[in-house]
Amino acid sequence: MKEIWDPKKIATSITREIQALAVLFQVCLFLFGGILGICLLLILLLNEYTRILAVLYIGWAFILNSRTPSRGGYPQALQIVRRWNMWRYYCDYFPIQSVKTTDLDPKDNYIFCYHPHGIMGLGAQGNFCGEATGFSEKFPGIYPHLLTLSMNFNVPFIREYTLSAGVCSVDKGSIEYILTKMGPGHSVIIVVGGAAEALEARPGSVKLTLKERKGFIKLALSNG
């Protein structure tokens, strides 16, 4: 007679569902986060009881802290999203792993290049927006800053979520600030193919878009 109720199978099934929900959460943010953020801000502005909060948020986020994405992002104490347990389930879904091949001197600053971009850069998020793959344990004293397009910081509320994951702007000034002004160990991760490479994403095919994207090499040389 077959065992109908198997605790191990049930636990595995529940864990797998949680993993799928973690990935779905990130995918939904990518697809609908911009619309949701704008709609939420409009709702707050139109409501007389929350209007002042919306105005204060706009002033704080887009005036007082408008340069934060290009100035190293949030300090580590405010990088709340990086500490979420969600990233463990997110990475286990695929699974996503990081493999250490050498030690890195924490006295230096580094430019890491990530490939492939894929459609949404899911691997980069899993490795560098949280600690699920053990980056800080493998490279103590190295502080990773995943970089993305500056336009992604124009979306209300999603902007704060992104900054709380330790993400910064990928513009030249931002990279130079992190490498030269934030101290030893602060390093950047550039998805070198960018949005152009995302358009080349196909199942079973990995293409590197690099020919017209060599600015990071110049930055590496100029910052020694």
Please state what every model-predicted region is.
Residues M1-K8:
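Short, charged cytosolic
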Residues W5, W60, W84-W87:
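A residue-identity detector for tryptophan
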Residues K8-F62:
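Alpha-helical bilayer-embedded segments of polytopic membrane proteins, i.e.
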Residues K9, L64, R88-C91:
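Short, isolated positions within intrinsically disordered regulatory regions of eukaryotic proteins
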Residues T12, P69, D105-P106:
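FNR-like FAD-binding dehydrogenase module
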Residues L53-V55, P69-I80:
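Interhelical loop segments of eukaryotic multi-pass membrane proteins
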Residues W60-G73, E176-K181:
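Short secondary-structure boundary segments
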Residues L78, R82-N85, Y89-G224:
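Soluble catalytic domains of membrane acyltransferases
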